[in-house]
Amino acid sequence: MLKDGTSVSNEVIQWKCVEFRIESKRLHYGRFVISPFKKGQANTVGIAMRRALLGEVGGASITSARFEGVAHEYSTVAGIQETIHDILVNLKEIVLRSDSDGNQKAILSVTGPKRVTAGDISLPPSVKVIDDSQYIVTITQPISVNIELNIECDCGYRIESLNEYRDGEFPVDAVFMPVRNVNYSVHPFGSGKEMREILFIEVWTNGSLTPTEAISKASKSSIDLLSPFLHTKHEDIPDFESNRDSSSLMKFSSRVDDVDKSEGDFFKNTFIDQLELPARAFNCLKRAEIHTISDLLSYSRDDLLKLKSFGKKSVDQVSRALWERFATELPNEKPRVVGDE
């Protein structure tokens, strides 16, 4: 019998938060137990939940900042200690919680001398700063500084091109990931035909969501993803044998392409940090300008072996991490890019 009263015999899978702690304003930890699973099921759920928690749970972030009278990102302003670039980096780190999914504006309007923090930002009612003490800039002289901020909600990462911005507006490399890390482990119990598995999931968030909220959102996302299969009818399945010349096959192929595109978009927004590779392998990939999972999947095993200081052991570590965290594998050969003739 589990702590919350769930027995193996009734086979009702239940979950419970068995540990929760606030390590800091921007680091919350939760540990969850889910059971009982039949053999093999716990690992399936663990992989799916880890991927959903890291890739499907969205958040709010500052995506751009507009400065008055600033020519370029590396400009310095008299009376301000930091460069514009340094300020943008600090704005990237600001943790926000938004109750609205739409784009919103915020204003940072202060007069020096002053040490400016996140608590000085004037936000719309639906947005709040998680940690008022997060540092932004120091104004060393009695001057006024006005910065217009754009806030958006999304999932994953977003790296904008500077070429798309004009008139003193600069992009902020936004991070829309309330979930910082996820671990899971599977533990068998019982014996023989009564052998079952317990799944433990550990979740770390940035404080904008509690781990329990993150688990709930990830679960809903996974359910929504699978719900179309609950309503499939026989007539929805194309009869390829009797209708080879119809448009059914083309429509079905188009749907498959949409699924591939969705996964491709996910990998484009997921950085290789999530693989938790050893430092040697990670640094080699970064030196080769491999920053996202999408970048990594454009290399075959043989391609990776050609990288400087990247041996078979490192390739095996990458392959194992890709499978364990994203249930995907390196291609057998370098993917062909259309137009490369």
From Swiss-Prot:
The keyword Transferase applies. Its main location: plastid. SUPFAM superfamilies: C-terminal domain of RNA polymerase alpha subunit, Insert subdomain of RNA polymerase alpha subunit, RBP11-like subunits of RNA polymerase. Residues 1-233 are annotated as: Alpha N-terminal domain (alpha-NTD). Transmembrane segments: none annotated. Keywords: Chloroplast, DNA-directed RNA polymerase, Nucleotidyltransferase, Plastid, Transcription, Transferase. Residues 262-341 are annotated as: Alpha C-terminal domain (alpha-CTD). GO terms for biological process: DNA-templated transcription. CDD domains: RNAP_alpha_NTD. It comes from the Eukaryota. Its EC number is 2.7.7.6. Disulfide bonds: none annotated. It is an enzyme of class 2 (transferase). Signal peptide: none annotated. One of its GO terms (cellular component) is mitochondrion. One of its GO terms (molecular function) is protein dimerization activity. It catalyses: RNA(n) + a ribonucleoside 5'-triphosphate = RNA(n+1) + diphosphate. It is found in: Plastid, Chloroplast. In plastids the minimal PEP RNA polymerase catalytic core is composed of four subunits: alpha, beta, beta', and beta''. When a (nuclear-encoded) sigma factor is associated with the core the holoenzyme is formed, which can initiate transcription. Belongs to the RNA polymerase alpha chain family. This is DNA-directed RNA polymerase subunit alpha. It comes from Marsilea quadrifolia. The lineage of its organism: Eukaryota, Viridiplantae, Streptophyta, Embryophyta, Tracheophyta. The gene is rpoA.
